[in-house]
UniProtKB/Swiss-Prot annotation:
Transmembrane portions of the chain: 15-37
Organism for this UniProt entry: Candida dubliniensis (strain CD36 / ATCC MYA-646 / CBS 7987 / NCPF 3949 / NRRL Y-17841) (Yeast)
Subcellular location(s) of the protein: Mitochondrion; Membrane
Pfam families: SNase
Keyword Hydrolase found: yes
Keywords assigned by UniProt, alphabetized: Calcium, Endonuclease, Hydrolase, Membrane, Metal-binding, Mitochondrion, Nuclease, Transmembrane, Transmembrane helix
One Gene Ontology CC term in the entry: membrane
GO molecular function, one term: endonuclease activity
Gene3D superfamilies found in the cross-reference section: 2.40.50.90
Protein name: Probable endonuclease LCL3
UniProt-listed Enzyme Commission number(s): 3.1.-.-
Length: 235
C-alpha cells in the first residue's frame, strides 16, 4: 500500500532540521542586520553616543557642519551613509537651533590651537577673526569626515577632521597650520594628534619661516596657550 501522506497541519518539532536551519538563518540575519545598523544607519547624536569602541577603533563618521563657533571648533551633524542613505535629498538636515538641540557633536580640531576670540569680557587675540572667518569659509555648511580621538573636559569631541576639495581630501588642522591661523597644541593635557604630530610640527615650522598668519607678529606673538593661562587662569 502507498504511504499515508503526512498531515500538513501537524506541528513540527523544534529540533526538526528545517526549524534549526530557519532559526539559524534568522539569528544570523538579525546579528548582521544589527551590525549594519550600528555602523551605517544609527546616528551619533551627542558625545554620550560615542562608545569606547568607536574611539578605540578610530571609526570615521561622516556628517554636516551646522555651525562654526570658534577658530578651532564646529558643530557636526552625523549623517550615516551620506547621500546614498538619502541625506540632503530624502532625509533633511535640521536648520533651526531648536531642531538641532541635542542632535550634534561639538568638534574640537585635533592637534591645533587657534587664536582666542573675545569671551567673557576678555580681549580677542590678533588673527582670531581671520581664523574664524577662514574656518567658516572652509567647512561651514559642508560635509566632513571626523575621526574621534577623545572627549575633553568641556564635552567636546577632539577629532581629526577631513574634507574633500577639488585637489583631494584635506586635513583641516593641517590646512589651518599652513596658513598660520593655528599653531600646534601646547597644552599638556587633551593633546590628540593621531599619527600626525610630526607632520603638524613641520607644517607649523614652514608657516613660521614664511611668517604666515600669526607668525607675522614675530616677537609680539602670544600663543593661544599662553593667552589662556594669562587671561583665564589669572596668571
Amino acid at each position: 500500500m502507498p504511504p499515508i501522506p503526512p498531515d500538513p497541519t501537524e506541528s513540527i518539532s523544534i529540533f526538526h532540521p528545517k526549524v534549526i536551519l530557519l532559526s539559524a538563518g534568522v539569528t544570523t540575519s538579525l546579528f548582521f542586520g544589527y551590525k549594519f545598523y550600528k555602523r551605517y544607519i544609527r546616528r551619533i547624536k551627542t558625545y554620550l553616543d560615542l562608545t569606547p569602541t568607536i574611539i578605540e577603533n578610530n571609526t570615521k563618521l561622516y556628517g554636516y557642519v551646522t555651525r562654526v563657533g570658534d577658530g578651532d571648533n564646529f558643530r557636526f551633524y552625523h549623517t550615516p551613509g551620506g547621500w546614498i542613505f538619502g541625506w540632503g535629498w530624502l532625509r533633511k538636515i535640521p536648520t533651526t537651533r531648536k531642531d538641532l538641540k541635542d542632535e550634534t557633536l561639538m568638534i574640537r580640531l585635533c592637534g591645533v590651537d587657534a587664536p582666542e576670540g573675545a569671551h567673557f569680557g576678555k580681549p580677542a587675540q590678533p588673527f582670531s577673526k581671520e581664523a574664524l572667518h577662514w574656518l567658516r569659509e572652509y567647512v561651514d555648511g559642508k560635509y566632513v569626515t571626523i575621526t574621534p580621538y577623545s572627549i575633553d573636559q568641556y564635552k567636546r569631541v577632539v577629532a581629526r577632521a577631513q574634507i574633500w576639495k577639488w585637489t583631494g581630501k584635506k586635513d583641516i588642522s593641517a590646512e589651518m597650520l599652513k596658513v598660520g591661523y593655528a599653531i600646534v597644541y601646547e597644552g599638556k593635557a587633551e593633546a590628540e594628534f593621531g599619527d600626525n604630530e610630526d607632520w603638524y610640527r613641520k607644517l607649523e615650522s614652514r608657516a613660521k619661516l614664511l611668517r604666515k598668519g600669526v607668525w607675522s607678529l614675530g616677537k609680539n606673538l602670544t600663543t593661544p596657550g599662553e593667552f589662556k593661562r594669562i587671561h583665564y587662569r589669572g596668571e
